[in-house]
């Protein structure tokens, strides 16, 4: 009974034995070889293929046949015919060359009159090391601790530490002179908006004038804006005037006051496009062709009658 566990242990060790491995770097040449156990039989053919289903070559006598886009420039077969060892050399290794390579022997007995062929195969694993593996190992072996983030709002900002201060855009200060009682507010903005559409283009130019408000003069400057819209039917120009006093109130008060339009005028100008001229030209050409056709038909009928009349008079 003790022999059975020993036998099972030996079988498990045999099947657990990994394939022979060959480790190379990218760009190097790798030589793979395997020996056959049956040295008495006659080798009919040897083969190399890469798992799972890629045939590299078949060798019979001095003939070597390559498959699956493999060539002798990439893989050279260095084994003499009917040798105990079969060898291939893979040149200029790439990452795609890594994998399990299998060599196979097809043998027959010289004294056997039957066509029985024995088969032996052996596997070798090729490992291609890339330069990126060491870099990945260094990155993975480093610290994976990420800095903690807080969503709490700080109570104050220390201006002495420049690295922790954010640049905040603030409006220009308003100058208030107590003696003169003069408030000066200056607005400067240029806005050009262009809108492109299938029917045409729209362009808006707005340039508000500076506003100066004094207690003594209380001068208010109106803002005039022109809007030009070009469409397929024509060009529409709109002129609007806005009282800047509302803008002054909006700046000084917390409540927002909408802008007021004092007056507006609209002018429409018709415009002809190339399509209209094409239609007119087509209609004119059609009329001319119709007139020519009518003339030709009339001429043909009259000429035919004239010939018929002359023929009858001759008879």
UniProtKB/Swiss-Prot annotation:
Extract the Pfam families matched here.
Answer: V-set
Question: Residue ranges, Intravirion compartment?
Answer: 304-315
What protein am I looking at? Protein OPG185
Job of this protein: Prevents cell to cell fusion by interacting with and directing the viral OPG040 protein on the host plasma membrane. The OPG185-OPG040 complex associates with components of the entry fusion complex (EFC) presumably to avoid superinfection and syncytium formation. Via its interaction with C3/VCP protein, protects the infected cell and probably also the extracellular enveloped virus from complement attack.
Q: Where is the signal peptide?
A: 1-16
**Transmembrane parts of this sequence:** 280-303
What keywords tag this UniProt record?
Disulfide bond, Early protein, Glycoprotein, Hemagglutinin, Host membrane, Immunoglobulin domain, Late protein, Membrane, Signal, Transmembrane, Transmembrane helix, Viral envelope protein, Virion
This protein's record includes keyword ATP-binding: no
Q: Where is this region: Disordered?
A: 194-213
Q: Name one GO cellular component term.
A: virion membrane
List of glycosylated residues:
37, 69, 112, 161, 254
Q: Which domain of life is it from?
A: Viruses
Q: Which residues lie on this side of the membrane: Virion surface?
A: 17-279
Q: How is it modified after translation?
A: Glycosylated; contains phosphate and sulfate-substituted glycans. O-glycosylation is required for hemagglutination and hemadsorption activities of infected cell membranes.
Localization terms from the record: Virion membrane; Host membrane
Q: List the disulfide bonds.
A: 34-103
Induced by what?
A: Expressed in the early phase of the viral replicative cycle.
User: What family, per the record?
Assistant: Belongs to the orthopoxvirus OPG185 family.
Annotated Ig-like V-type domain residues: 17-121
Q: Cite the record's note on assembly.
A: Heterodimerizes with OPG040. The heterodimer OPG185-OPG040 interacts with components of the entry fusion complex OPG143 and OPG094. Heterodimer with C3/VPC protein; disulfide-linked.
How is this protein positioned relative to the membrane? Single-pass type I membrane protein
Phylogenetic lineage: Viruses, Varidnaviria, Bamfordvirae, Nucleocytoviricota, Pokkesviricetes
């Amino acid at each position: 009974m003790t022999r059975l566990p020993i036998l099972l242990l030996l079988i498990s060790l045999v099947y657990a034995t990994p394939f022979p491995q060959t480790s190379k770097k990218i760009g190097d040449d790798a030589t793979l070889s395997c020996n056959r156990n049956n040295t008495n039989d006659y080798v009919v053919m040897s083969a190399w293929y890469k798992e799972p289903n890629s045939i590299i070559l078949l060798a019979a006598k001095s003939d070597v046949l390559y498959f699956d886009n493999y060539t002798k420039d990439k893989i050279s077969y260095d084994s003499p015919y009917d040798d105990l060892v079969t060898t291939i050399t893979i040149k200029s290794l790439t990452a795609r060359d890594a994998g399990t390579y299998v060599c196979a022997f097809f043998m027959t007995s010289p004294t056997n009159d039957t066509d029985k062929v024995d088969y032996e195969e052996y596997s070798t694993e090729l490992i291609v090391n890339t330069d990126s593996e060491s870099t990945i190992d260094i990155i993975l072996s480093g610290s994976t601790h990420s800095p903690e983030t807080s969503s709490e709002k700080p109570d104050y900002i220390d201006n002495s530490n420049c690295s922790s201060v954010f640049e905040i855009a603030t409006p220009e200060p308003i100058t208030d002179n107590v003696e003169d009682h003069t408030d000066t507010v200056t607005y400067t903005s240029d806005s050009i908006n262009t809108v492109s559409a299938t029917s045409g283009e729209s362009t808006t130019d707005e340039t508000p004038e500076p506003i100066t408000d004094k207690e003594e003069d209380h001068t208010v400057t109106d803002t005039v804006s022109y809007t030009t819209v070009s469409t397929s039917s024509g060009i529409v120009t709109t002129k609007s005037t806005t009282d800047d006093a509302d803008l002054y109130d909006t700046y000084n008060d917390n409540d927002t006051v909408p802008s007021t339009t004092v007056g507006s005028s609209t002018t429409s100008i018709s415009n002809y496009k190339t399509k209209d001229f094409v239609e007119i030209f087509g209609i004119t050409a059609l009329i001319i062709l119709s007139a020519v056709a009518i003339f030709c038909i009339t001429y043909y009928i009259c000429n035919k009658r004239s010939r018929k009349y002359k023929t009858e008079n001759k008879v």
